[in-house]
A protein has these predicted regions:
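Conserved alpha-helical substructure of the radical SAM core
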Residues: 1-78, 82-86
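Short beta-strand segments
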Residues: 31-36, 64-67, 90-91, 153, ...
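Active-site beta-loop-alpha junctions enriched in small/polar residues
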Residues: 37-39, 68-70, 92-94, 118-121
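Short, charged/polar "capping" segments at the starts of alpha-helices
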Residues: 72-75, 95-102
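Non-cysteine beta-strand/loop elements that form the S-adenosyl-L-methionine
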Residues: 84-95
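Basic phosphate/pyrophosphate-binding loop/patch that engages nucleotide-derived ligands
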Residues: 98-120
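Acidic/histidine-rich catalytic cores of soluble enzymes
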Residues: 115-131
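Accessory C-terminal segments flanking Radical SAM cores
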Residues: 130-201
Length: 201
């Protein structure tokens, strides 16, 4: 996918949490997901990010992590345990996913597994055109547009869609006035909402 492989810098992360804090105060921030295209646990300050995120959203809101399991060992699970994230493990590498799931389950952190690439495949809103013939994901309503979810990209831009691999759905930046961030359908006939397996509400 056409995204540069970089880590979010700490200042951008703090600004993103300020945006989250605004929506927590508004009463509309019901959960937070620390995930993305790529492996979130590769970030050198990942455990700190989880801790800071939990401090902002409190213990009563869902904090979700997705991982391919390569870095989720007993030590990582132990470090994450105080913050009670809900961890989903991808089954792309079963031989790595199994021990990761054991480590997360032992700490009460395993929320589920992800085998969507095999049993609920999609084409990343047209970004993976070669997957289009294999799309088997259900034609559900897009929760990003329906519930007002957004994605913060690595550079702090705020996007409408988690499947937007090139920034086409950007509506602003984490340092913008939150009231100006309006999510909307995006893309053209080949990339974006029109090419997605989900329905625009």
């Amino acid at each position: 996918l056409p995204r540069e492989k970089v880590d979010m810098d700490w200042d951008t992360f703090v600004a993103a949490l300020d945006l989250v804090r605004f929506f927590v105060r508004q009463g509309t921030q019901t959960e937070l997901s620390l995930t993305g295209i790529g492996e979130s646990m590769l970030h050198p300050r990942f455990v700190e990010m989880v801790a800071e995120s939990r401090a902002v959203i409190g213990m009563g809101r869902l904090l979700t992590i997705t991982t391919n399991g390569l870095l989720l060992d007993d030590a990582m699970a132990e470090a994450l345990e105080p913050f009670k994230p809900a961890i989903f493990v991808s089954l792309h590498r079963p031989e790595k996913a199994a021990p990761a799931m054991v480590a997360a389950r032992k700490r009460g952190l395993l929320a589920g597994r992800n085998a969507a690439f095999a049993d609920s495949a999609f084409n990343w809103a047209g970004h993976q055109e070669n997957w289009t013939p294999m799309v088997s994901a259900p034609n559900i309503k897009c929760e990003f547009l329906n519930a007002g979810w957004c994605v913060v990209l690595v550079d702090g831009r705020v996007a409408t869609c988690c499947l937007d691999a090139d920034g086409s759905s950007v509506v602003g930046h984490v340092r913008d006035d939150p009231e100006t961030l309006t999510l909307k359908p995006w893309g053209d006939a080949k990339i974006g909402c029109s090419a997605c397996h989900m329905q625009v509400p």
